[in-house]
């Protein structure tokens, strides 16, 4: 290892790399440690979606800030590859009046914070998504600013190119600001930030983070455009979109790693949703399966901030690390370097679990 850095960041996913970027922007020397390399974990398989439609104030604000960063990422990260953002929109469908009422509450909050989402009638959802069957649709929530990146990995690589990333497995985090390595020895620093996703509780066992599997099915590229916005049905636990290269992506959001379940069961659930909602996709084969892992907390909210004297954490994102990473990077960097405590840290701190201050995020996909 090289000379002693000011800060060690454990984890070279998009969250850890964003933290390293913002720390360096504030003049800190930073070493990023990861046992497998840049974007080798969940960041490497996430499909690149970004949205501002959330059900809690803190996530709406973080997502809004992150979207502004990503809009300028080409310049900020000195990118040589266009990540290819497509503002196709996210459409959330409601199939009951109670679900629609919750969507109205979410949209009211989002509008208050400057997010241009709106409630749609069933007929309006059908106009937005040609071919959508609305017999079971009570309404929807929509924002045209949401979308996805064709090449999300280019953003992760751009963050990584600006960081000092070293291959190394961390086996222990010391309260005094050091990490112990599997290869032997320690790396000393003034502060340590753990952004290791599902690996975080191995290093910080006091944190209630658990792994939860997610499964994405992909078709081969299709020339015909069959589905432009991303369509999510929380009640049917289903989501689908067509990517820029023509592949159709579909997810059975109820497939949570049940060892008794079979791939054919998950495909059957997706086929059932296609038949009821998107019949134009019924005959699209989905031969490719990608498995990812969410790092999940009891309230499906991230854990951010200081957890020990010289140790900070940014983990437990339930699949939205990519969506929030730029804002999280700024917040953690300000806390570590300047001692500034962003409002998000007061609601996403680790102490909320023991104190009963849980704030469930209802809009997890």
Language model regions located:
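Core beta-strand elements of the Rossmann-like FAD/NAD(P) dinucleotide-binding domain
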Residues: 3-5, 182-191
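N-terminal Rossmann-like FAD-binding beta1-loop-alpha1 element of flavoenzymes
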Residues: 7-31
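Active-site substrate-recognition segment that forms the wall
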Residues: 21-25, 50, 81-86, 196-309
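Glycine-rich FAD pyrophosphate-binding loop
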Residues: 24-44
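Dinucleotide-binding Rossmann-like beta1-alpha1 core, especially the glycine-rich loop
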Residues: 47-128, 237, 257-259, 274-275
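Short beta-strand to alpha-helix junction loop
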Residues: 61, 93-102, 142-158, 261-266
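Helical element adjacent to the flavin cofactor pocket in flavoenzyme catalytic cores
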Residues: 142-177, 181, 190
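C-terminal catalytic lobe of FAD-dependent flavoproteins
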Residues: 278-365
